[in-house]
Amino acid sequence: MEKFETFTGIAAPMPLVNIDTDMIIPKQFLKTIKRSGLGVHAFDEMRYDRQGNEVPDFVLNKPAYRESSILVAGDNFGCGSSREHAPWALADFGIKVVISTSFADIFFNNCFKNGMLPIVLPQEQVDLLMKDAEKGENARMTVDLEAQEITTSEGDVIKFDVDPFRKHCLINGLDDIGLTLEKADAIKAYEERAAQERPWV
């Protein structure tokens, strides 16, 4: 997993509430176990018509938002089934941060495990960021995880909370495998000691 570093990116406004995981990545794309290649199918049923053509009015199809790395979303983002393909699809599209007033718990946790930062803020602050995101390609925000700050295109600074352990993992690029490998020496020492103490096991 890549280390999460301070970055400046385009923020896309997506005010619709209750965007569920089926809207993020429909069920027909869940056959793969690869994390790459799903970005093209993110928000598939909103992004494309039945003929597979792009829907011009969908926010991520607009020229100003095609390179978005931040989503400012409506309440209860990521609700629905617990498919991990949802954060896979967003990450593969290029999304690094999702900001909302609330998230479904499983989706929220899966974001951290896949190198994405979900940020929960009060409604008034989300409204401010949503308005800023509506500026199109000028809607560039800076996210500083170390300082736990979002800086808008106008220079307004918004503080956010994040669990210290989750923050540590993102900053150091540690997923579950990476966390285990941090303890590789201790695991090896335990296995060697256990083999001597209980050779019959």
UniProtKB/Swiss-Prot annotation:
Q: What CDD domains does UniProt report for this protein, alphabetically?
A: IPMI_Swivel
What Enzyme Commission number(s) does the record list for this chain?
4.2.1.33
What pathway does the annotation place this protein in? Answer: Amino-acid biosynthesis; L-leucine biosynthesis; L-leucine from 3-methyl-2-oxobutanoate: step 2/4
The kind of enzyme this is, by top-level EC class, is lyase
GO cellular-component term (any) = 3-isopropylmalate dehydratase complex
- Matching InterPro entries, A to Z? 3-IsopropMal_deHydase_ssu, Aconitase/3IPM_dehydase_swvl, AconitaseA/IPMdHydase_ssu_swvl, IPMI_Swivel, LeuD
> What biological-process GO terms show up in the record?
L-leucine biosynthetic process
Record PANTHER family: 3-ISOPROPYLMALATE DEHYDRATASE SMALL SUBUNIT (PTHR43345:SF5), 3-ISOPROPYLMALATE DEHYDRATASE SMALL SUBUNIT 2-RELATED-RELATED (PTHR43345)
| This protein's name | 3-isopropylmalate dehydratase small subunit
Q: From the UniProt record, report the name of the gene that encodes this protein.
A: leuD
